Amino acid sequence: MSKTLHIICHDVPWPADYGGVVDLYYKMKALHEEGIKIKLHCFDYGRGRPAELNKYCEEVNYYERTTGWKAVSLSVPYIVKSRANPLLLGNLLKDEHPVLMEGIHCTAFLRPLLERNRKIFLRLHNVEFFYYSQLFQSERNLFKKIYFLNESMFLRQYERKLPDNLPVLAVSNNDAVFYKEELDKRLAIYLPVFIPYTQLNCAEGIGTYCLYHGNLSVAENEKAVTWLLNKVFSLAKVPFIIAGKDPSDRLIRKVKRNKNTSIISNPSTGELNDLVAKAQIHVLPSFNKTGIKLKLINALYNGRHCVVNDEAVEGSGLEDACHIGTTSQAIASIITQLYHHPFGEEEIGLRKRLLGQTFNNKENARQLIQLIW
């Protein structure tokens, strides 16, 4: 008998070009390959309605997101309230199939569905209130800082009040443990993120520069780059390339003032892949302990040495594949040591074992199917 699953996504998951939709797109693809029929529900606010999604979905439903003051509530986070479209609830109530909610964002109709004894599963992208607290600390714009702080406070209460019997599927072991121990959600488990990579493509030998890549329009990533410029590459005198989407004018000016450093704005997919492959060291610190860092997974599958701080890998299972520095001085020292050190078979073998055990889309899809049915 065929199995059908509703999936609610906070955004249109194609192109799969950022963390929140990479996991969903490749999860959807893996479920389809296991014979699951998917009814996709997503909120369209600028990414269009791509035909690509029809390859894996029995049906695709698009909804408008309410924005501005109409989505402001004194009890529900904005990211949730703005997606409380009644058309979505109407479509979900047309049958009795289980529902996978992709992120806290998509939980507006959680309780009405549970009251009807529907099987509901929540995919947790981050511990959202902690993530928004980190965004508050990284943001410079006063209006955005106020928004992130308020949203973090609302999310803290909202996440704590989620039903205790709700199965929660976290993308990192740390997040699963936090939900279990701090929020008393006993059904929280770790389900690894679904990824686009099926095999390692790391070049042996020595590359020619250090690389940081990421969405540079995100305040958290700009903070990481600024920290690297001020604290790390002022000590490690080696070529440093920063590549990513929409860097601010402020960041571009800062990079230009730093010797041995350059910035590549909005590289194409091919250009970014080439940069990742040719780098000697991927320097990818984070100041956010929650979630999983997909840019680090990209570097581990397709690049040479990876240097990180504790926050970037804690609870991820990726610690053994990375060089970890606890301070800026330690990271600079590791970079200096590795810059002329060839990347070879031993490191590749370690990554094959570590990554292959964890990020297996087929096995993880089968685990998800067993959980749901």
Annotate each language-model stretch with its function.
Residues 1-58, 94-96, 234:
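N-terminal subdomain of nucleotide-sugar transferases
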Residues 148-200:
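Donor nucleotide-sugar binding/catalytic pocket of nucleotide-sugar-dependent glycosyltransferases
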Residues 23, 190-257, 262-277:
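Conserved catalytic-core segment of nucleotide-activated headgroup transferases in glycan assembly
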Residues 277-291, 302-305:
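Acidic donor-binding loop of glycosyltransferase active sites
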Residues 26, 87-93, 128-131, 139-168:
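Membrane-proximal helix-turn-helix segments that form the acceptor-binding/catalytic region
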Residues 67-76, 118-154, 215:
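Acceptor-binding helix/loop patch of EC 2.4 sugar-transfer enzymes
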Residues 295-301, 305-309:
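Short hydrophobic beta-strand element within catalytic cores of glycosyltransferases
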Residues 83, 342-373:
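A charged, aromatic-enriched C-terminal amphipathic alpha-helix characteristic of glycosyltransferases
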